[in-house]
Amino acid sequence: MTTRHLTITDIASTGAGIAYEDGLRVFVPGALPGDEVTAEVDPPARGTRSSVAQYVKITRKSPWWAASPCPAHVARPACGGCALGSLTPEGQAAVKRGLLERALAESGVEAPEPLPLVEAPHDAEAFTQGFRNKAVLYPGVDPEGRWYFAMYAQGSHFPVPESCFCPQTPEWMAKAAETAARMLSLSDLSPWNESHREGDVRTIVMRDGVDSEKPQRLFTLCVHGETPEVRIFVGKLAKKLMEEGITSVFLNLHPTPGNAVLGRHSLHVAGTDGIETTIGGLRFAVRPETFLQVNPGQTERLYAMALEWVAPEKDEVLLDLYCGVGTMTLLAARTCAKAVGVDIVAASIERAKLNAKRNGIENAVFHAGAVEDELPRLIASGIRPAAAILDPAFKGLEETVPAMLTALPLTRFVYVSCNPKTFARDAAKFIELGWRIERLAPADLFPGAPHVETVA
């Protein structure tokens, strides 16, 4: 190792700070953009120009530094949920805009200057408090043998005890997690250990039906397998949670190894069969596995921008690819002749159809299948969409999709991305095929996290 004095100018998706020196990219965990640090730097891995530093001390704090209100952020190890938690809103905005700009530059994409970051008002409590409609917590056991549920430390599978209550989530979630932990402490069940691949309880997932006329609260216990002990326990837990105001309880079975939060099968245990939430004036059903953005206020802004830009007209057909449970499909269907949604998750498509019926929308149709498989079928069927919405997962588009879309009579499309790097990669492909970016904007749906959405 060598001791280096570094200035942090960038941040990785993991939350580690990045410094550049003598052609070397140095990752510095725990450091923030604008920090000046003294660190011990490992030699670069063979064949690379990247290295990892062991943080020693900050010699000068970032000009954007601000004390975090969350005790889990300053714990050691710190919670991995909010790597940017010690930056001002202005600092976070600059960092997130920079993530998009650097991704575009690295891919050689010529684009107009991004519009200002779409963010919650700085004076709004929702910027940092109680804005999430979903929490995922992992089990831990303290030295006295008491269970707790918390978020993982950055880059690890260690649940940070101080993160049992996250100020970004509604208070009821911490109380429900505490109830589950207290009852598990008296049971014979054990936390799942990914390294040894043994144990019972893998995680809990809680979801809030925001904008509901009455509280709608969903609790899911995710376990490795449905043993007799698990069945008995979840029955007792569900009874207690229902007494405390939870309205829907599920048991999720996750028998396979890996980091996926939930398994494929969820069993309804008690209460309603899911909850509801409102987006853009429409109501959507929510179950444990339903994908929805976790920041309701920012979701409204994000979707409104996407729909304003794509501007579906009353005589047009619109494609919504990677449509999930049909949120933007149904919102767009209100102003176009026909909206067609495609998603690989069959359960999401079934929910999308139910959501269409729930909202009385008859001009939306849905297809279950991979986009790269369904597009040729749609083209062969003679569909002639004029506009499209693309909202893929973190990995972006499959390699064949840009050319398939170019073969359609599209006049425009909107791309909503959760990963600047894959967005920039895909944008470069579209530009090669003759498309151009007219405008784009970063959007902040995760205050405190090194994550940025993009609308283009």
What are these regions (language model features)?
Residues A19, G34, C82, I204, ...:
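Residue-level signal for inorganic ion chemistry
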Residues T3-H5, S13, P228-V455:
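Rossmann-like S-adenosyl-L-methionine
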Residues E198-S212:
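Short edge beta-strands and adjacent turn/loop segments
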Residues M206, E213-G225, R283-R287, A387:
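Short, aliphatic-rich beta-strand segments
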Residues F127-N133, E213-P215, P450-V452:
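A short, glycine/Asx- and small/polar-enriched loop/turn
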Residues M1-A75, S156, L319, D373:
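Terminal RNA-binding accessory module
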Residues V56-P71, R76-N193, T227:
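Extended interfacial segments that mediate partner engagement and assembly in macromolecular machines
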Residues A31, E40-A45, Y138-D142, R207-D211:
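Short beta-strand micro-motifs enriched in acidic
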